[in-house]
Regions:
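Hydrophobic residue at the +6 position relative to the catalytic HRD Asp in the kinase catalytic loop
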Residues: 219-224
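Histidine-centered phosphotransfer motif of kinases
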Residues: 216
Length: 224
């Protein structure tokens, strides 16, 4: 946290993207059909936003007493990405043609980027990954908690997961940038040792890279 604070690194790009108006009820109806009534979203404003998705607090009717979140793919993402993909591939093709470049395969690089980005917008794939990561850490240690993803309420456009109380690393860093004692703040809020937690997360991520079949490969501050 102190390293980020000292660098003056901007964090708003990680988890403070502008909110896009989404008709959540309509998305649920389209994605879940008759099961849509099982998801009750708390309010119409997301509590977290990203470049591809917005996240809302919600309740699941057939699982009373627990708190959940629903991650919804921004409707504009697919629309704009399809246009961007065509433009990117054309520019790479034109560049490769004009430069007569056979060493640096621009079109192949563009195709790989497009394939990877499409995977990022498919929450069925993310569901499989989330379940695999949860199972790995459940077998390995009780020091890392991964939320459960509800497969019966998840589709290509939405994910429903249980809500785990905590502090995002971005908030901790912002407090450090303001000159606050972040270690004491985390201890007061959660009763935990931030330094030990960061060491645990860092070491477990490194071990997972070597041992796990599937890893979470995007541990930026907005995701921790």
């Amino acid at each position: 946290a102190q390293v980020y604070a000292a660098s003056g690194y901007r964090l708003d790009a990680f988890d403070d993207v502008a909110v896009e108006p989404i008709d959540v009820a309509e998305v649920l109806r389209q994605e879940l059909g008759s099961k849509a009534s099982q998801i009750v979203v708390d309010g119409d404003q997301p509590f977290a936003t990203g470049s591809f998705a917005q996240v809302y607090h919600c309740r699941v009717v057939d699982r009373p007493g627990s708190r959940y979140i629903i991650k919804i793919l921004r409707p504009s993402v697919v629309r704009y990405l399809n246009f961007d993909f065509v433009a990117l591939r054309f520019c790479c093709w034109a560049g490769q043609f004009m430069l007569k470049n056979d060493i640096f395969p621009l079109v192949e690089i563009a195709d790989e980027f497009i394939k990877t980005t499409k995977r990022e917008t498919d929450y069925q794939r993310e569901l499989i990954t989330a379940q695999a990561i949860r199972e790995y850490f459940a077998r390995r240690t009780d020091r890392v908690v991964v939320p459960e993803t509800l497969a019966e309420y998840s589709t290509r456009r939405i994910l429903v997961q249980d809500y785990i109380e905590g502090l995002p690393l971005t908030e901790v860093v912002e407090r450090a940038q303001a000159g606050n004692d972040t270690y004491q703040f985390v201890k007061d809020q959660l009763g935990s040792d931030m330094q030990q937690q960061l060491v645990t997360v860092g070491s477990e991520f490194l071990i997972a890279i070597l041992q796990a079949d599937i890893i979470m490969a995007d541990p930026h501050p907005g995701n921790i």
